[in-house]
Amino acid sequence: MALTLEALVKRFGGEIVGDAQCTVSGLAPLDQAGPQQLAFLANPKYLSQVETSGAGAVLIAPKDLEKLGAAEGSLTSGPRTAGPSNFIVTANPYAYFARVAQMFIDLATPPRAAGVHPSATIDPSAQVAASAVIGPHVTIEAGAVIADDVQLDAGVFVGRGTTIGAGSHLYPNAAVYHGCKIGPRAIIHAGAVIGSDGFGFAPDFVGDGDARTGSWVKIPQVGGVSIGPDVEIGANTTIDRGAMADTVIEACVKIDNQVQIGHNCRIGAYTVIAGSAGIAGSTTIGRHCMIGGAAGIAGHVTLGDYVIITAKSGVSKSLPKAGIYTSAFPAVDHGEWNRSAALVRNLDKLRDRIKALETALAAQGGTDA
């Protein structure tokens, strides 16, 4: 479906420079876009790509348009002789692109008819809205509530007493255990598990060494998981239920694939967590935080609002102050790494030598005096 720039601006805002009747039917990167596609410039370092792009129109920030020779809604020297002549000027081209992309997906995706697939298993006490879409081999246990316009794809499991909020979409084989609350418009991708038991075991051992006897005693996890509105959870991510109170994911949190969130954690609103991060139990993460891929956060710590943890960093203590924190070792040339590792191994010997030299110098100074 093709849309005019005028139609896009009417829906999403912004200002048009060029032909308001220019039509676009999709989106593409600057260096690949054709005359029927809309591109965007989010980073000024790619400004040169705008000048050579074949895009029909470009989403661009005001300051970047000025660098191309246009300002105040009109081209200063007439139509451009190279590159696009049509622009939508907006303060945040990246976010604008995301909204337009979502609109094109929605337009291209035929709505699924409401109803329950014959192979689904639904307990008679469960409440399923008439507008919900229940796919093949879905299981909905006793007392569960499936709200309006929810879509449960093939193989989804919803445990007893769990609530799935309106407009949510659970992709194939996602599992939400008993006693969980999923807010409206949640997106839970394939294979994610919400509400499995937290990792809680009490040690019950006596003796030492080979004479040690006993075992680990499982601590029942009687809390649940409470997820706010507009949360997205990636494929194969696991969020453990609380030991006594709920694990809480606040509004608009975005969690990537294969993330582990331990029991009794609280993740603040608008925080984003990249893939393979691990967050141990009873940790609180503030609002608007960013957790990099494969970062590890110890249990029982608190991160304040607007904290950024870079990829592969390890957090072992609370970080209440906003800022960027790094503990990962970036990749370097293999030979350089080996030399650095050798130095690290010998740091204790170097320290001892320095102490010995300082002691000798101090003694010599005393003798000279």
UniProtKB/Swiss-Prot annotation:
Enzyme class per UniProt: transferase
Disulfide-bonded cysteines: none
Active-site positions on this chain: H263
Keyword Repeat on entry: yes
GO BP term, pick one: lipid A biosynthetic process
Coiled-coil positions: none
GO cellular component terms, A-Z: membrane
GO molecular function, a single term: N-acyltransferase activity
EC numbers on record: 2.3.1.191
InterPro entries given in the database record: Hexapep (IPR001451), Hexapep_transf_CS (IPR018357), LpxD (IPR007691), Trimer_LpxA-like_sf (IPR011004), UDP_GlcNAc_AcTrfase_non-rep (IPR020573)
Keywords: Acyltransferase, Lipid A biosynthesis, Lipid biosynthesis, Lipid metabolism, Repeat, Transferase
Catalytic activity: a UDP-3-O-[(3R)-3-hydroxyacyl]-alpha-D-glucosamine + a (3R)-hydroxyacyl-[ACP] = a UDP-2-N,3-O-bis[(3R)-3-hydroxyacyl]-alpha-D-glucosamine + holo-[ACP] + H(+)
Recorded metabolic or biological pathway in which this protein acts: Bacterial outer membrane biogenesis; LPS lipid A biosynthesis
Family under the similarity heading: Belongs to the transferase hexapeptide repeat family. LpxD subfamily.
Complex and partners: Homotrimer.
Described purpose of this protein according to its UniProt entry: Catalyzes the N-acylation of UDP-3-O-acylglucosamine using 3-hydroxyacyl-ACP as the acyl donor. Is involved in the biosynthesis of lipid A, a phosphorylated glycolipid that anchors the lipopolysaccharide to the outer membrane of the cell.
Protein name, per record: UDP-3-O-acylglucosamine N-acyltransferase
Organism of derivation: Burkholderia vietnamiensis (strain G4 / LMG 22486) (Burkholderia cepacia (strain R1808))
Taxonomic path: Bacteria, Pseudomonadati, Pseudomonadota, Betaproteobacteria, Burkholderiales
